[in-house]
């Protein structure tokens, strides 16, 4: 017979352990590496760096009216520009970058113009840019009949929109608004003799770096700091 009533025997209950949750991975997978393009593989990056050098030169000449420009090429990881002007301090880089950001926000078009060497000389003399005159003379010595290429920012000469120009073969972006200002940084100041000639004036060289994205800039800066250790 089956026991019943209040005196019936009871079967003790057993606690059942809940299944263990799978252990979380101890280490999250590393983020994918940031692709760092080169000038050779990215014409867009090359244009960004070249145009940024022009924007920097325009900013410097706006802040220091008597500054004279020389050359401003792109280099492996950025650009530089040499100026004949009073010595700069590191704090001046912030002023220049702030002015550059304003120029970028204005979305000034970059316009190409071909002129004769005689017309280029006239404009350079009018602008009182002696170093550009030396550069022009070098071009004429190599090829007396070569047309001279100028790049203008804002508009063509003689128009109210014209802001700045340089003796330059390009290439450039279509307008300054295409420059990613959060991927641009001014890095350092150095002295450099014009043409490497110690008998010539000591120029102020501003080095900068420019990339396509802020992530690339951050990675570049991380690698620079890592190399210092």
Task: Please place each PLM-identified region on the residue numbering.
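N-terminal chloroplast transit peptides
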Residues: 1-2
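Short hydrophobic alpha-helical segments enriched in small aliphatic residues
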Residues: 5-8
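Auxiliary tRNA-acceptor-end handling modules of aminoacyl-tRNA synthetases
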Residues: 16-23, 27-48, 59, 68-71, ...
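Metal-associated gating/positioning segment near the N- to mid-region
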Residues: 62
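Short, glycine-/polar-rich solvent-exposed loops and beta-turns at beta-strand/coil boundaries
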Residues: 73-75
